[in-house]
Amino acid sequence: MRTLLLLAALFGCTSARADDAAGLGFDPYDQSKVPLEVQPPPDLKGQKIVLVAGSKSHGPGDHEFFAGTAVLMNLLKQTPNVWPVMARDGWPKDESVFDGAACVVFYMDGRGGHPVVKGDRLKKMQALMDKGVGWVNLHYAVDYEPKDGATVVNWMGGYYDPRTSINPHWDADIRALPKHPITRGVKPFNIRDEWYYNMHWVGDKPDVAEAKGVTPILQALPPDNTRGTADAKKYLGRIETVAWAYDRPDGGRGFGFTGGHSHRNWADEDFRRVVVNAILWCAKVDVPEGGAKVAFDPVDLNRNLDQKGKPFQKIAPAGK
């Protein structure tokens, strides 16, 4: 017993020292306070939005799906009459979480390991889409094998096709913004991330301008030396779309956002607002003229992180 007490004290002190050294005053890995799969009251007068975080991925500070989804949940709570419900590890434990959702959001690893394509889940999501439910994929979640992308493209208007799309890290200088509810309150910004581009667009169109129903939301000019696929190299000097909205023929809405690799980018107000606005728009919630409220304390970048087997390093906004 004495040995167990000593070990407990040792590990407790080690954790405390790590917290104190970072100057946080809290355990950055404590995820226990994040409410999971909490359903709204039966008399909810508003929209339920389901956010699904992927499992642990990449190194510290990157692909922080749990922490990033928790950030989004807290941001969405700042909009009246919205009830965000968060699930973890790629899929809800209780699939009834999806019942009555106005929008579903997936922030997770994609392609062959995409949680959405396992078993009969695509069919279950198709049933939601048939009801006009909104569809949002963030970062790696926009990446599908072509056999699955052929379905998802009809929900989102475009997807990352591993045969032709590309995923470099570069500084996206977002200058021109279209007039759209998603861009309300969003100012031009420049931010480094793993911005995917050269998407596979609905209708098998090579250019987003030809993709019916798709509105480019964020566009920037990538360095030509980032065009790592033969298809991407066909379009040297082309401004590329890194986030887009889709008005589905059935009246539903979709949104794809290729950023979100670097967790620190949630500290950027315009980065946050464009994603929150998009989720609200896909849920058919009126986006305020000045954009959604997205108040955020940068110290919260260090909350709810996944433990990834490396010493803790404080996450700060870019340039800090």
Model-derived features: positions:
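Extracellular ligand-binding/catalytic regions of CAZymes and related secreted enzymes
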Residues: 19-44, 71-74, 78, 224-226, ...
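Extracellular/periplasmic catalytic domains that process cell-envelope and extracellular macromolecules
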Residues: 42-46, 77, 96-100, 128-131, ...
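A glycine-rich, often tryptophan-bearing local segment used as a flexible ligand/cofactor-contacting loop or short
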Residues: 111-188
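Helical hinge/lid and interdomain linker segments adjacent to catalytic or ligand-binding clefts
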Residues: 20, 25, 57-137, 141-144
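Sec/Tat signal peptide C-region and signal peptidase I cleavage site
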Residues: 14-18
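Bacterial N-terminal signal peptides
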Residues: 4-13
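Structural recognition of the beta-strand scaffold that forms the well-ordered cores
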Residues: 48-53, 83-86, 102-108, 129, ...
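Catalytic beta-strand/loop cores that center a nucleophilic Ser/Cys/Thr
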Residues: 27-37, 161-250
